[in-house]
Amino acid sequence: MNSKDESPSVAVERALAMLEAVAHEPEGLSNAEISRKLQIPKSSASYILRTLETQGYLNRDAASGKYRVGLKILSLSRGALSGIDVREVALPIMRHLVEKTSLTCHLAILDGPEAVYIEKVEPPGFIRMDTWVGRRMRVHATSVGKALVAYIPQERREKIVSERAMEKRTPKTITTLPRLLKELEKVRTQGYAVDDEENNLGARCVGAPVFNQQGAIEASVGLSGTIGQVNAQTMPRIVEALKDAARHISMQLGYRAPHRRVGA
């Protein structure tokens, strides 16, 4: 059967299969490789590939003859990802995190100089955190707040963070700009933030950043418990679980961490 005489459904199925195959090969695929991989006649594959190239969905390298994903695909993916609700993505991961750690989990976003809780998952039991969805907290005294403000552009950070805004919530609260800036540098280095009884005495919290497709900070996810629950012995396990959850949420939002060069 001539490729032009294929039924529309078969042609569409083959075109989508080709796009997926090329998308999974960073070095690209040639017509022959695609035909062999998908068991499609070379004449049919050639016709569909030319059409996809003409429409901007694929790019063909003249030297190697290999096809790679085109910018049209990127624009479509951005449109799809822009409609993703971070709460919807994060909630099942947060529930799993709570089951794993038996701690309260919060999802927060930055709104002006404050961190706002937009989701909360609690474990079963008698210990309850005095927090709720919609509660606003100054960024300097919470782990989710520090995780948010640590990754915004420096100019915006300096506007948000000022000593006037650093209310002393407990004797352990950071209330000076130099100390907070040093703390935020530590957050960026280790990839997570800690609230060590800085917002409420007897409570210790850990927060990690969530990034979007553009690599910008989108939200932060945090785990909260008593100082007995979050201590020197349990902290490494809690941090590992939290960072893993934040990474999974970020990936579902389209984020891809940059590859580190060997020796860099």
Predicted regions and their residues:
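N-terminal helix-turn-helix
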Residues: 1-88, 250-255
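Short amphipathic alpha-helical signal-transduction/dimerization elements
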Residues: 23, 145, 149, 153, ...
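Short, acidic, Ser/Thr-enriched surface-loop or helix-capping motifs
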Residues: 62, 110, 211-213
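All-alpha effector-binding/dimerization core of bacterial HTH-type transcriptional repressors
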Residues: 78-126, 151-154, 180-183
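Short, solvent-exposed recognition segments
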Residues: 126-199
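Extended hydrophobic
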Residues: 176-245, 263-264
